[in-house]
Amino acid sequence: DIAVVCGKPEFLPDAHLDTLTNPILIVEVLSPSTADYDKGAKFEHYRTIESLQEYILVWQDKKRAARYTKQIDGSWLLSDFIGEESEIKLSSIECTLTMDDIYDKVEFEEEAQN
C-alpha cells in the first residue's frame, strides 16, 4: 500500500510513526481477505481525512483498479479501470499510470500456468 503527502508528513500524536493524518492520495492493494474491509469500513474512515483527494484500489489477481476522487461538494466519484489499455489519471499528484506501470513484473496465475 502507498500513501502520498505533499509537504511535511503529519502523524497522530502518541501513536506509532506510521499513522499519517495528511495524505492526499492512498493506494490499497486488494486481497480476497481484506477487499470488503478496504472498500467499506476503511474507506469510510479515510473519507474523514480532510486532505485526502484520491483513493485507489488495485486488484492483485487481475488488471483492474478503482479510483475514488473527492468532489468539490465532498462527495466521492468512482471510476473503474479494467484491462490492459486502461490509464489512471491521478489529479492529486498530476500523474498518469498505465496498467503496465501498476502491474510491472506481476505474473498472474493463468499466465504462469501457460
Language-model regions, residue ranges each:
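C-terminal interaction segment
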Residues: 1-49, 54-114
